[in-house]
């Protein structure tokens, strides 16, 4: 009975989808609708899987900085499995409210602010326990710290002097440590002081009657007199009386100078009606979080002004009226609601009785043929092959499933109990995927960081890519020759990202196809093999040029040098021609003599 009784302030699981994990919410209000149903106004909490990877990296960096500041190794003693499951316990608080049917509640949980002095294993040892340390804004996509920091420094901490010994005098100048604003031993009596304060109130009322802005805000004499009786007018009058040595005549002359009576206004009078409405709206949304109130609603006001206005606003009749209305609404609202245990079968449940197939992910017309647990697919989380109940998980075409224990873990914590292959590679990356020879054979899921589906067999899920080839049609070959001016293959090759106008090519091909249908398709000229070229050169040798004879010299002896004819077989092996070959000197054989 107590387990199914939900009250305001409880952290509960909400189910919005049969295949997705539970939503974690905190009940703020329980309202009864006109139809008799109960709706819960809740505060939203988000999991790590609900926010972007960029914000997750920022959250991990923030956690690492806190760990370094506290000089504790939180995750050093944890195993990979514990680190994996600890991420499922982390939540992100938000200021977002929503209304959900109370019948979608599926149980209670516990959410607490991260305690730095407590071990993180305490969250893993307790069921349905979560923690948070950052606030997530769904509209701005930002993360902020939920708790304030201790301000350290001379601006925030007092410099404590050393304790004086017995009989030692304080050498500090007292006038610099305190300011005297009132003398209780004044020559005036209490009655005279009260009469002076009455005169100060009257001067303040008259000053508001002369001020145009004040006359608009306080249109009646009663409202002006009430505004003139506030503390700022009385404090100014008493300070004036003290500064003039309690001389009533000189103090009154200061209150009513030649330019007109002195007008003293506090934050209650400085704020307009629209600003007051914005403040009440912000106070309803954020409570006494004055930093958020200033940031989102009143950025032109200082934090000091907002805090001062808040404590003055609490003294007004409007605050008293709102407090009474809230108390009356709280009495009329529901304080608790009883939700029976949800016992309907889940659409993802795989039915194995009577040979009837179970629906996959609740999709209409999509079925999953159950297999023998001993011979079929194993659990995607714990790799178990036996379970009293199986649930389909993931995309329908993958045909993955979870056992009953892992399915409940998935619904509550939003993840699998065991780390997937992609997460293990992040912890200890394998060098095999870095090799370009192996990378082409890795499955697309592993390359994109997605978990590879486990089939329950020890065989690898990696498959080779299917071979294919491109076959050019006769139309394409003919169009390349007929439509050269339109196609312009050389220009198109230099601009690979510019689309080719196939409509113009088809139109030109259709016009010229009739007149060129009888002509054969011009084939490309092919080069003759090298052996044929060598044979032709042997049969038809090049003409020998005239022999160049040099003039005999008297100092140098006569020498003869024979230029050998290069072997043609070396040309066929190397497949290259040097400078002498290109200039027709390959057949030259001559003697150089003096």
Curated annotation (Swiss-Prot):
Return the PROSITE patterns for the record: BAH, ELM2, SANT
Task: Give the Phosphothreonine positions (modified residues).
Answer: 455
Which Pfam families does the protein's record reference?
Answer: BAH, ELM2, GATA, MTA_R1, Myb_DNA-binding
Q: What inducers act on this gene?
A: By estrogen.
Quaternary structure annotation from Swiss-Prot or TrEMBL: Component of the nucleosome remodeling and deacetylase (NuRD) repressor complex, composed of core proteins MTA1, MTA2, MTA3, RBBP4, RBBP7, HDAC1, HDAC2, MBD2, MBD3, and peripherally associated proteins CDK2AP1, CDK2AP2, GATAD2A, GATAD2B, CHD3, CHD4 and CHD5. The exact stoichiometry of the NuRD complex is unknown, and some subunits such as MBD2 and MBD3, GATAD2A and GATAD2B, and CHD3, CHD4 and CHD5 define mutually exclusive NuRD complexes. Interacts with BCL6. Interacts with NACC2. Interacts with PWWP2B.
Domain ELM2, chain residue ranges per copy: 148-259
Q: Which residues form the SANT domain?
A: 266-318
Per the entry, what this protein does is:
Acts as a component of the histone deacetylase NuRD complex which participates in the remodeling of chromatin. Plays a role in maintenance of the normal epithelial architecture through the repression of SNAI1 transcription in a histone deacetylase-dependent manner, and thus the regulation of E-cadherin levels. Contributes to transcriptional repression by BCL6.
Domain of life here? Eukaryota
Q: Which SMART domains match?
A: BAH (SM00439), ELM2 (SM01189), SANT (SM00717), ZnF_GATA (SM00401)
Single GO MF descriptor: transcription coactivator activity
List each copy of the BAH domain by range. Answer: 1-147
Zinc fingers, GATA-type class: 379-406
Residues bearing Phosphoserine?
428, 430, 519
Compartment(s) of residence = Nucleus; Cytoplasm
Gene3D superfamilies per UniProt: 2.30.30.490, 4.10.1240.50, Homeodomain-like (1.10.10.60)
Q: What is this protein called?
A: Metastasis-associated protein MTA3
Quick one: a GO biological-process term for this protein? granulosa cell proliferation
InterPro entries named in the record: BAH_dom, BAH_sf, ELM2_dom, Homeodomain-like_sf, MIER/MTA, MTA1_R1, SANT/Myb, SANT_dom
Q: Which family does it belong to?
A: Belongs to the metastasis-associated protein family.
Q: Name one GO cellular component term.
A: nucleoplasm
Phosphoprotein in keyword set: yes
Keywords assigned by UniProt, alphabetized: Cytoplasm, DNA-binding, Metal-binding, Nucleus, Phosphoprotein, Zinc, Zinc-finger
